[in-house]
């Protein structure tokens, strides 16, 4: 695990964007394509807007990039809270990404079927025995959740690399998420976290004793890949080391 701490949100985003470009181009050179699982939320939105801006959009052959979603809210794709819709507006439309390169969760299906079908689509994409994304982008919630791996949910104990539906009792809503074992098979995993509101969660996940029920992001530990954190000084404020 490597922790990269920067002075500001702007520096965090710029450095993660540069990292994204490097990983993407290396994968394209080696295999002819780049597979990335996107994260939802306000922080990743700023990253996607940066990647599709004039300073970055010419640095990757975007027609060789295949986009997936590490988690999704169980809402229509036209809903304002949809991770797909956010990525569509911030990334896909500005970069003119074709539908053949966008692998979204079909939220028109029943929730368990949506999760199952997404797992099947991912398995078909990866012809090798092991499902191994080139890059999985993750955020971190104030409650130490990542993707839709929330505290005290049964999916935390899944041991199979797959996609599952999760019911969040406090929100009375479903989400669909990669399991931790699926995330952990990736070649590269990157957390994007900034702001003092995330400082406690960063400390819990990185430095506290293992307690996945309360700090689910502790589950993220790539088995044969690289884990990097991109955080600002505010988010790192409670780290002891």
Outline where the language-model segments fall.
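Glycine-rich beta-strand-to-loop/alpha-helix junction loops that act as flexible
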Residues: 38-43, 138-142, 194
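Class I SAM-dependent methyltransferase SAM-binding "motif I" and its flanking Rossmann-like core
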Residues: 138-181
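Glycine-rich N-terminal segment of FAD-binding domains in flavoprotein oxidoreductases
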Residues: 32-55
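A short secondary-structure junction signal
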Residues: 115-116, 147-152, 201-205, 241
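ATP/nucleoside-binding phosphotransfer catalytic cores, i.e., glycine-rich phosphate-binding loops
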Residues: 187-241
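A glycine- and small-aliphatic-rich helix-loop capping segment at beta-alpha/alpha-beta transitions
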Residues: 49-60, 85, 151-160
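N-terminal glycine-/serine-/threonine-rich phosphate-binding loop
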Residues: 1-36
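Ligand-binding beta-strand-loop-alpha-helix segment within the catalytic cores
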Residues: 60-134
């Amino acid at each position: 695990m490597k922790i990269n701490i920067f002075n500001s949100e702007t520096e965090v985003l710029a450095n993660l964007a540069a990292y994204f470009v490097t990983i993407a181009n290396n994968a394209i050179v080696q295999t002819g394509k780049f597979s990335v699982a996107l994260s939802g939320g306000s922080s990743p939105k700023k990253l996607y807007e940066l990647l599709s801006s004039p300073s970055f959009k010419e640095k990757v052959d975007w027609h060789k990039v295949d986009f997936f979603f590490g988690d999704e809210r169980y809402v229509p794709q036209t809903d304002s809270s949809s991770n797909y819709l956010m990525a569509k507006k911030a990334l896909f439309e500005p970069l003119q990404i074709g539908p053949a390169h966008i692998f979204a969760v079909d939220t028109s299906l029943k929730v368990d079927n949506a999760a199952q079908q997404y797992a099947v689509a991912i398995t078909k994409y990866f012809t090798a025995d092991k499902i191994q994304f080139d890059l999985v982008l993750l955020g971190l919630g104030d409650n130490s959740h990542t993707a839709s791996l929330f505290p005290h949910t049964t999916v935390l104990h899944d041991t199979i690399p797959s996609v599952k539906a999760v019911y969040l009792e406090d929100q009375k809503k479903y989400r669909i998420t990669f399991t931790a074992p699926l995330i952990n098979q990736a070649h590269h995993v990157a957390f994007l976290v900034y702001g003092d509101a995330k400082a406690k969660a960063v400390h819990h996940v990185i430095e506290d004793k293992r307690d996945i029920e309360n700090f689910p992001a502790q589950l993220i530990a790539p088995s044969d890949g690289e884990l990097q954190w991109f955080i600002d000084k505010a988010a790192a404020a409670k780290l002891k080391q």
